[in-house]
Amino acid sequence: MEKFQSYLGLDRSHYFLYPLIFQEYIYVLAHDHGLNGSILLENAGYDNKSSLLIVKRLIIRMYQQNHLILSVNDSKQTPFWGHNKNFYSQVMSEVSSTIMEIPLSLRLISSLERKGVVKSDNLRSIHSIFSFLEDNFSHLNYVLDILIPYPAHLEILVQALRYWIKDASSLHLLRFFLYECHNRDSLITSNSKKACSSFSKRNHRLFCFLYTSYLCEYESGFLFLRNQSSHLRSTSSGALIERIYFYGKIEHLAEVFAGAFQANFWLFKDSFMHYVRYQGKSILASKGTFLLMNKWKYYFVNFWKSSFYLWSHPGGIYINQLSNHSLDFLGYRSSVRLKPSMVRGQMLENTFLIDNAIKKFDSLVPIMPLVGSLAKSKFCNALGHPIGKAIWTDLSDSDIIERFGRIYRKLSHYHSGSSKKKGLYRVKYILRLSCARTLARKHKSTVRAFLKRFGSQLLEEFFTEEEQVFPLTFPRVSSISRRLSRRRIWYLDIVCINDLVNHE
C-alpha cells in the first residue's frame, strides 16, 4: 500500500478521495486487492479485454450525470445506473470500499511505525484468542456476555467514518450509494432485516468495511475509558489495537469523554479486565465484584444509546460467574475449573498431605452442536447415524475420499486445542462411515461388501497430520507418541472458522 501513497498524493490533497473514483487505475487496484475477486471478471458475458471498456463507460456516464440525488427518489427510473444497474452497483461497491480503505491503511502503517509495533499475522489467528484466555482468565471472577447491537439505520454506518474521512463529497457519494441499494432491496422485501442481509451478501466487502468501522468506533470509546480507569495497562490492548485499524480516534475521545466521565472513573477501577470480541458478540471478564460488572453493564447500554442512538435492553448483557459458567464461542466450550492436586510434605518424622485446588482454564469440543452441523450438511441424521452423500456419487472414488478426509483433517486441526479429544472420535466415525456409504451407493453395493472387496486401507486419508507425524518422530517410544497426540496444540495459522464449526 505504501507504493500508492505518492502516486495518489493523499497527503497533498488532505484525503480528498472523491476524484479517485474517476481514475481507471483505482478500478485495477480494486480488482487486484479484491476480497471476493473482481465483479468485472465474474460477470457472465464480459472477458478481460472488455472489462476495461466497461470501466471507461461507467466513468463517462458518471461524468455526464449531475442529478445523482434525484435518482434515489425514483426507484423505477435511474438514469445513473442504466440498464446494467445491478452490475454497475457491484462495481461501485468494490471501488468505494477500496478507496476508503486507502487512507485508513496508510494511517495504520504510520501508527505501527510510530509505536514500534511489529505487525504479526499470528495476531489474526483464532487460536491466539484461546491461548490468551488460558493465560489471563483463570484468576478472574465474573464475565459479561455482550450482544453488540446492530446499527438500525444506514446513517450510523456513515457517521462512523466522519472522523477518518475528511472528504465530504466521498461521504455524500457513499450515503447516496447505500440508500440506492437499500431502496432497491426494500422494494423486493418489506422486512428491513432481510433487506440488510441482502445488501451485505451482494456488497460483502463494503458492508464488512462499514461494520468494522462501526465496531472500531464503539471499541475506541470503551478502550479509552478502560485505560483511563486503570493503573495497569490491559494485556489485551496490544492485540486489540492490532486487530482494529484506528489509533487517532483515542486522542479525539480524550477531549470528548474527559469532562463527561472524569467524576465517575473511580466506579470502574479494575486492574484485571480483559475484552474479546467475536462474531458480533463480545466478552468482558474482570476480577471485580458483581456490583462492578453491573455498573459496566449499564454503562454499555447508555453508551450505545448516547453515542450511536441504539436502544439495547440490559437483558441482552448477561453477568456470569466464571466458576459456574461455560463460554460457548468459536467452536469451543471453555470454562474455568478447579483442578485438584495433592502435595506431600514431611516435617521431621511427620508426613502429611495437603489438598490444593488450582484454577485452570479448560477448552472442550461441544460434540452435540458439531454433530448437529454434520446433520445439517447431510453427513448424518439428527441422531448422529451416518448417511451417504448422494450428491457426491458422480465424483471419482479418490475425489470422494479426499473430500471426506479433508473435512475431518480441518475439523481435527481446528479442535486440536481441546483437552479431551474423545468427541472427535465420534466425528471421525460419522465421516468414515458416511464416506463408505457414499462409495457403496456409487458402486451399487452394501457397505460390508464394499469394504470386504476393497479393504479398509481405502480410507487411510482420515489419519490426521498429528497421527502421521508423531509416530515418525518417536518410532520406538509409542507411549510418548500417544501422549503427545493427546496434548493440546494451538495453531497460529488458523485465520478463519470452518462452516461446520460455526454453530452461531
Swiss-Prot record:
One GO location term (cellular component)? chloroplast
Q: What are the coiled-coil residue ranges? A: none
Q: Is Transmembrane helix there in the keyword field?
A: no
Its keywords, alphabetically, are:
Chloroplast, mRNA processing, Plastid, RNA-binding, tRNA processing
> Matching InterPro entries, A to Z?
Domain_X, Maturase_MatK, Maturase_MatK_N
Tell me which Pfam families the record gives.
Intron_maturas2, MatK_N
Plastid among keywords: yes
Where, per UniProt, does this protein localize? Answer: Plastid, Chloroplast
Q: Which domain of life is it from?
A: Eukaryota
A Gene Ontology BP annotation from the UniProt entry: mRNA processing
Cite a single GO MF annotation: RNA binding
The family line of this record is:
Belongs to the intron maturase 2 family. MatK subfamily.
- Which PANTHER family does this chain map to? MATURASE K (PTHR34811:SF1)
Its biological purpose: Usually encoded in the trnK tRNA gene intron. Probably assists in splicing its own and other chloroplast group II introns.
Name this polypeptide is given:
Maturase K
Designated gene of the protein: matK
